[in-house]
């Protein structure tokens, strides 16, 4: 079982670089053509015709029904797009506009990663609308939503609340109704923007009423570098299918995994008795059931997205903050986020729902903590809970953390699933002291 480490994002590995046709890397933050962070949500409302106040949301959605005739009957009837057609840059001017800092500030004077997740979610949707832009129509007939956060890789750079941040991204792969989006985040150091984060999201297109799938414009790579990005998108799709097909919900653990669980079970048996029922916790270990934290959120209209469902970025922020608190409580010191991966949006969350979040440590190794957050919703009228998301976060603690031990078969499967996510990370690196990302 190899040691996991911080996944580094390399400028140009996940997106196009200056020499490859798209503007990247060091930039003047005052350049023309760059969106302000506040403009992203405003632009999205304009594209879909969303209401700015809750009382008009029904009327706005009724107007969107009229856009159904603009939907393509097949993908063949849609003009192809280039990667640079969807490329956009967004500025978060924490340094030049100090009034923005309060929203992003932690008590340790660093940047709230949960807020960054919200911004990435909005940016990913806007990028896809740019890819599918219809010049003859004021509003888009598509309802584009986040289907999956494939991965977010952190770089060894500190996130200062006193320096400007820039986001950039573009569509890198397209299927029939889905799109992969590559995004990067940079922070100003001196007179240049340096990369601090690399993210891959998968978005899906729905019809104007968000009831069924809709076709998206095809994507044509224009260079060997773009062809490689597109090929990587195909590989990512295959990897996700393979990972899903071998899920512990579908297949039994491997022989090696079964051995791991059995050895852990044997190490918890009381040597003073000859019984499978008497369990003793090994030294420097914690029962998995004792690592849980829970929270409840009432989903108010303020947290709605442009389609009057609860904003996916809000769900990610709340899940991340609970996961961070779980890792902090478990490890006894300040944790640092290393990776986010495989966040599947299984079901939309309606405004007015009760959101139940349950977080627990499911795997540890050395000073790494793998946290799983399970999200459920229930309406005020019905008591039945429905799963909407499962979130996976990897943290690194400032000191070595206890081992986590499962008691039941179900917890053993959570342990193995956490181990799989942990081992899926890229190979070794060291966390620098200036790498500070907090809730």
From Swiss-Prot:
Q: Name one GO cellular component term.
A: mitochondrion
Tell me the residues of the organelle transit peptide.
1-21
The listed locations are: Mitochondrion; Mitochondrion matrix; Mitochondrion inner membrane
Q: InterPro entries attached here?
A: HOTDOG_ACOT, HotDog_dom_sf, Thioestr_dom
Coiled-coil region: none
Q: Does the keyword Oxidoreductase apply?
A: no
- Limits of the HotDog ACOT-type domain: 84-209, 289-401
The protein's role, per its UniProt record: Mitochondrial acyl-CoA thioesterase. Catalyzes the hydrolysis of acyl-CoAs into free fatty acids and coenzyme A (CoA), regulating their respective intracellular levels. Regulates both mitochondrial lipid and amino acid metabolism.
Q: What is said about its interaction partners and assembly?
A: Interacts with NYAP1, NYAP2 and MYO16.
Protein name, per record:
Acyl-coenzyme A thioesterase 9, mitochondrial
What gene is behind this protein? ACOT9
